[in-house]
């Protein structure tokens, strides 16, 4: 009997020792987890700016809602000037440098995304009618972001992103903005939509080289009927577009090199009567630049 009691005592002792060790380990793990959570809270980084994400807009904004979207300006990049001074982003200096000319046939598999200015490139024989186009009168970046159904020049309808996603072009040229910049004042919503549009396109077309084209110059008299379309403001906006393009790993093209006169206005011989759109005679200069 004594041997049995001794044996039972030893078994219970081992059992309690195992239970004690297990409990101690559990307590230690809980303490370590608590310390880890506390450390993360004390050292966590600021939350990223969700305004730059590609999915915050799921419905189309119209009317008074247009200017309610916040915008954080693209990072300011410094560039070297001829007098060795440093200045903020200048779209003229940020533009893609010239490269050897290519044949028109090279544009047969590229796509253009734009508004009525780009429609001219599609319609006029002096443009690039052999290319593919997503060009719609009155279009702007929000149309692309919100998946709006757009009307083509031939009367058909389509959703721009659906067409581009199905097409997967090797190269895409974008020119959008004139239609929403008519009014003077804040243009932050336009830039926000432009950022979102580039994010969406880059995600949908991972193998496509994207070229962001500058807002085109206009004639000086345009300001009387369209207060937001004047040289100084368009230069400011193009500076922002150039910074956004570089930030998004897109190339930036300065169309003013091909279309503007020495004063920075749309060349008179290229201008339609409205001072904004381009005559057929102006498209060869645009094509040559591309």
What annotation goes with each model-predicted range?
Residues 100-192:
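Conserved SGNH/GDSL esterase-like catalytic core that processes O-acyl groups on lipids
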Residues 187-197, 234-235:
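Charged helix-capping and loop-helix junction motifs
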Residues 218-290:
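Catalytic His-Asp segment of secreted/periplasmic serine-dependent ester chemistry enzymes
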Residues 205-209:
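A short helix->loop->beta-strand "cap" motif at the edges of active sites that frequently abuts
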Residues 180, 216-219:
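Active-site-proximal loop/turn and secondary-structure-junction residues that shape catalytic pockets
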Residues 1-109, 118, 122-123:
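N-terminal secretory targeting modules
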Residues 175, 213-214:
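Alpha/beta-hydrolase-fold catalytic nucleophile elbow
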């Amino acid at each position: 009997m004594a041997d049995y009691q001794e044996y039972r005592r030893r078994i219970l002792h081992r059992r309690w020792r195992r239970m004690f060790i297990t409990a101690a380990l559990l307590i230690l793990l809980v303490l370590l987890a608590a310390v880890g959570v506390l450390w993360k809270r004390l050292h966590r980084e600021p939350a990223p700016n969700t305004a730059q994400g590609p999915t915050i807009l799921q419905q189309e904004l119209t009317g008074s809602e247009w200017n309610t979207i916040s915008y954080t300006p693209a990072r300011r990049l410094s560039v070297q000037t001829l007098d060795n001074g440093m200045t903020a982003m200048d779209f003229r200096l940020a533009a893609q440098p010239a490269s050897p000319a290519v044949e028109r046939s090279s544009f047969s598999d590229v796509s253009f995304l734009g508004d009525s200015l780009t429609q001219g490139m599609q319609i006029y024989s002096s443009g690039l009618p052999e290319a593919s186009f997503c060009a719609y009168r009155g279009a702007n970046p929000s149309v692309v972001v919100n998946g709006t159904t757009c009307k083509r020049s031939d009367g058909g309808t389509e959703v721009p992103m659906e067409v581009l996603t199905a097409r997967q072009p090797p190269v895409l040229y974008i020119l959008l903005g004139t239609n929403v910049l008519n009014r003077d004042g804040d243009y932050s919503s336009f830039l926000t939509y432009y950022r979102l549009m580039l994010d969406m396109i880059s995600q949908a077309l991972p193998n496509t080289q994207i070229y962001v084209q500058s807002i085109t110059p206009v004639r000086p008299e345009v300001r009387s009927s369209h207060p937001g379309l004047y040289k100084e403001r368009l230069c400011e906006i193009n500076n922002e577009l150039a910074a956004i393009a570089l930030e998004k790993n897109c190339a930036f093209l300065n169309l003013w090199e091909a279309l503007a006169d020495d004063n920075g206005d749309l060349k008179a011989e290229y201008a339609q009567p409205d001072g904004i759109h381009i005559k057929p005679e102006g498209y060869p200069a645009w094509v040559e630049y591309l």
